[in-house]
């Protein structure tokens, strides 16, 4: 199974940002942990991070043309307003999971709305970095 993991704006600063919201795990450790988990699950995991909306759209279009079995995406702040990322995700027929480290519905009002959620199959929010592992496990359980 081939899964694309996309992390959006500011996620490369995990470990430097507000630990009460995002925990203390840094980005490199998160990716290393997820790659190990994916290997145990016999999953081919490609990880991508960008602070640029267009780069994320380009990566999604590339993945569409190459073919992937599933997408896990944490768009960061793009969650709340990026119709470009939403539209790029919408063309996929594979499973798509939106992940958020913090509980976006218990934060500032502007964070409560996700324009991404309607084009995803599942939203995981508020489980910390464990949410990424839950997404991987779920995708393996539904046996794409």
Task: Name every feature range the model reports, one short phrase each.
Residues 14-28:
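Glycine- and acidic-residue-enriched helix-capping/strand-helix junction motifs
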Residues 35-48:
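Short beta-strand elements in bilobed, periplasmic/extracellular small-molecule ligand-binding domains
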Residues 41, 92, 118-119:
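Short, structured coil segments at secondary-structure junctions
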Residues 1-4:
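Extreme N-terminal starter segment of soluble prokaryotic enzymes
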Residues 91-107:
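Short, acidic/small-residue loops that bind anionic groups at enzyme active sites
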Residues 49-71, 77-80, 84-93:
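N-terminal small/polar loop signature for handling phosphorylated ligands or for N-terminal nucleophile
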Residues 47, 106-144:
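Short, glycine-/small-residue-rich phosphate/pyrophosphate-handling segment
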Residues 9-11, 76-79, 102-104:
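Short glycine-rich anion-binding loops that position phosphate/pyrophosphate groups of nucleotides
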């Amino acid at each position: 199974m081939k899964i694309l993991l996309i992390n959006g704006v500011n996620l490369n600063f995990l470990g430097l940002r507000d630990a009460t919201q995002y925990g203390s795990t840094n980005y490199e450790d998160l990716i290393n942990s997820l790659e190990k988990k994916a290997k145990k699950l016999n999953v081919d995991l490609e990880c991508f991070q960008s602070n640029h909306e267009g780069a994320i759209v380009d990566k999604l279009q590339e993945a569409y043309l190459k073919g992937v079995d599933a997408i896990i995406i944490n768009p960061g702040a793009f969650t709340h307003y990026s119709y470009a990322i939403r539209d790029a995700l919408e063309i996929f027929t594979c499973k798509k999971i939106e992940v958020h480290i913090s509980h976006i519905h218990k934060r500032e009002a502007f964070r409560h709305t996700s324009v991404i959620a309607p084009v995803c199959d599942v939203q995981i929010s508020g489980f910390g970095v464990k949410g990424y592992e839950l997404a991987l496990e779920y995708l393996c359980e539904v046996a794409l």
